[in-house]
């Protein structure tokens, strides 16, 4: 055989070996469709399990936050009202120190202290969206509760004559209706 023929033969054999190796690689790379589907299903199942666990954890966290919000909803109000309590305690201790000689002075200071404490309490209520219900004019059953009716030449029927107990709202909700007497 000539050298060229020998080279051609060798080159052809090399090409056949390369093609055979590539064919074997393709066969190795080709995956059974059932196995591929099973692997994909397993991957989706794993993702589902993780997502479900994340969802359940978030749900538990939200429930805990909700319970804490309900349990401590009035914490801010309670802190504010403690200052009013302190004022009352100071007033009571001032009374304990009173005697006949300083009774007038203590009474005057008590009156001033009660006024200041009243204003302090009103500010706490206002800060917490608690407002007094306006109880002048015509009776409104949504915010007033009629305790009695009285004869009155000065007022029209269903006009409020007297407020027995003030009413209050918290935001837009009636906390306690105003107790009133109305004209017949």
Curated annotation (Swiss-Prot):
Tell me which species this is from.
Sulfurovum sp. (strain NBC37-1)
An annotated GO cellular component = cytosol
Q: Where in the cell is it found?
A: Cytoplasm
What is the designated name of this protein? Protein GrpE
Instruction: Report the InterPro entries cross-referenced here.
Output: GrpE, GrpE_coiled_coil, GrpE_head
Q: Which Gene3D superfamilies match?
A: 3.90.20.20, Head domain of nucleotide exchange factor GrpE
Q: Describe its assembly.
A: Homodimer.
Q: What protein family is recorded?
A: Belongs to the GrpE family.
Which molecular function GO terms apply here? adenyl-nucleotide exchange factor activity; protein homodimerization activity; protein-folding chaperone binding; unfolded protein binding
Query: Which ranges does the record mark as transmembrane?
Result: none
Query: Pfam families from the entry?
Result: GrpE
The alphabetical list of record keywords is:
Chaperone, Cytoplasm, Stress response
Q: What is its main location?
A: cytoplasm
Outline what the protein does: Participates actively in the response to hyperosmotic and heat shock by preventing the aggregation of stress-denatured proteins, in association with DnaK and GrpE. It is the nucleotide exchange factor for DnaK and may function as a thermosensor. Unfolded proteins bind initially to DnaJ; upon interaction with the DnaJ-bound protein, DnaK hydrolyzes its bound ATP, resulting in the formation of a stable complex. GrpE releases ADP from DnaK; ATP binding to DnaK triggers the release of the substrate protein, thus completing the reaction cycle.
